[in-house]
Structures are given as structure tokens and as C-alpha cells.
Swiss-Prot record:
One of its GO terms (biological process) is proteolysis. N-glycosylated. This is Cardosin-E. InterPro entries: Aspartic_peptidase_A1, PEPTIDASE_A1, Peptidase_aspartic_dom_sf. Heterodimer of a light chain and a heavy chain. An intermediate form is produced first, and undergoes proteolytic processing to remove the internal plant-specific insert (PSI) and the propeptide. Pistils. The active site is at D35, D134. GO terms for cellular component: endoplasmic reticulum; extracellular region; membrane; protein storage vacuole.
């Protein structure tokens, strides 16, 4: 089939999005996180089993070598999200996607510009930073210096935040217990590639995300 295939996703409290895969003949079903931040497939298995591993097989199942994510923020709705192999679902985005070239193929990594808090430049990424869109990360991770400023701004006045694409407080603050809210930003400095942002589910919920393997591009459009 050279068209596309749609996988329904389950939203687990806005922290993870799961879907089913089938392995073997007849297929045995497993529930997995479709993780764009990992090159490894992890599934439960029996110990000391005989198996044959195929590590470099290309089937060209789909005409377009791309896949796209839509993650639903509303945990009360039956439809938790959607992963489309080989195409896009126009029901889940508005307007055109903005595409950026992949700069490091081990991850879906790309360059980003300055980081703004409200309408003020932090200057932190003015010379340029790197980021990658990671469907397997719940939060939005970034360097400690700038994330500290962001979390301080959230606590002070909860202004609208912009990180190249705008995020509102409703999008980056997570629900905890009845009287508790959790910041969707977490600090991370361990990188050999310079300042790095991981744009996890907090970012991918408001922005429909396309991973174009054929052209080595990542695209974002407003989710619908």
C-alpha cells in the first residue's frame, strides 16, 4: 500500500501517548510509546529465546517517507491522539507547516533562534541553539539558565510565552492534584552539542508535527 496508515493514540494524563504494534506471524500486539527521541524499539520478551534480528531492511511501504503526530491535550476525550505513517491528516492542523532542515540525523534535530519570555528577548539563543522534537518526552527541556527564567516568569505573572512558536499558560502548565499545577519546563544541561532543547509533548500538543524522512525536514503547524 503506497498510501498512508493511521494509528490511534491513547493519552495517559498528558504525560505519555501510547499506540499498538503487531510483531510476528500471526502478529502479537504490544502497547508502545512511538518515541521520536529513540532509535530503539523496546518490547517485553521471553528470556533465552532464539531469534533472528533484521537490522537493515527497507520495504518502501509508503509512497511518502514521512509521518506526523497530533497529540490531544483533552484527557477526557476518547481520541487521545493520532500518528499517521506516510502522510498528514488535514483534520488535525490549520494552515501550512513551517519546515526546518534536520541538522543531526541521530535525532530529529534542528536549529532554533532566540528565546522570548513575553515579548522580551533573553538573548540566550540569539547566536543559535539546537532542538529536537521528541514524542517520548512529556515536558519541554532546556538549559538551566533559561528554564530558570521561564519558571520564574510563570510564577510571577503567568504571561504568554514564546519559544519560536507561541505557547500559552494553558499549554505549558500541567494539571497535578486537585490544588496543584506543574510547570511543563525542566532544566537539562548534559549535552556535547551545545545548548539543546527537547521539544516534548508540551510543545507537540499545540503544534501538529511532521517528520519528513525523505527530505530530512521537521514541520510544525497549529494543531486543530
Amino acid at each position: 500500500d503506497s498510501g498512508s496508515a493511521i494509528v490511534a493514540l491513547t493519552n495517559d494524563r498528558d504525560t505519555s501517548y501510547f499506540g499498538e504494534i503487531g510483531i510476528g506471524t500471526p502478529p502479537q500486539k504490544y502497547t508502545v510509546i512511538y518515541d521520536t527521541g529513540s532509535s530503539v524499539l523496546w518490547v517485553p520478551s521471553s528470556k533465552e529465546q532464539d531469534f533472528i534480528e533484521a537490522t537493515d531492511e527497507t520495504d518502501n511501504v509508503f509512497l511518502h517517507r514521512r509521518f506526523s503526530f497530533w497529540l490531544n491535550r483533552n484527557v477526557d476525550e476518547e481520541e487521545g491522539g493520532e500518528l499517521v505513517f506516510g502522510g498528514l491528516d488535514p483534520n488535525h492542523f490549520r494552515g501550512d507547516h513551517t519546515y526546518v532542515p534536520v541538522t543531526y540525523q541521530y535525532y530529529w534535530q534542528f536549529g532554533i533562534g532566540d528565546v522570548l519570555i513575553g515579548d522580551k528577548s533573553t538573548g540566550f539563543c540569539a547566536p543559535g541553539c539546537q532542538a529536537f522534537a521528541d514524542s517520548g518526552t512529556s515536558l519541554l527541556s532546556g538549559p538551566t539558565a533559561i528554564v530558570t527564567q521561564i519558571n520564574h516568569a510563570i510564577g510571577a505573572n503567568s504571561e504568554e510565552l514564546n519559544v519560536k512558536f507561541g505557547l500559552t499558560p494553558e499549554q505549558y502548565i500541567l494539571k497535578g492534584e486537585a490544588t496543584q499545577c506543574i510547570s511543563g519546563f525542566t532544566a537539562m544541561d548534559a549535552t556535547l552539542l551545545g545548548p539543546l532543547w527537547i521539544l516534548g509533548d508540551v510543545f507537540m500538543r499545540p503544534y501538529h508535527t511532521v517528520f519528513d524522512y525523505g527530505n530530512l525536514l521537521v514541520g510544525f503547524a497549529e494543531a486543530a
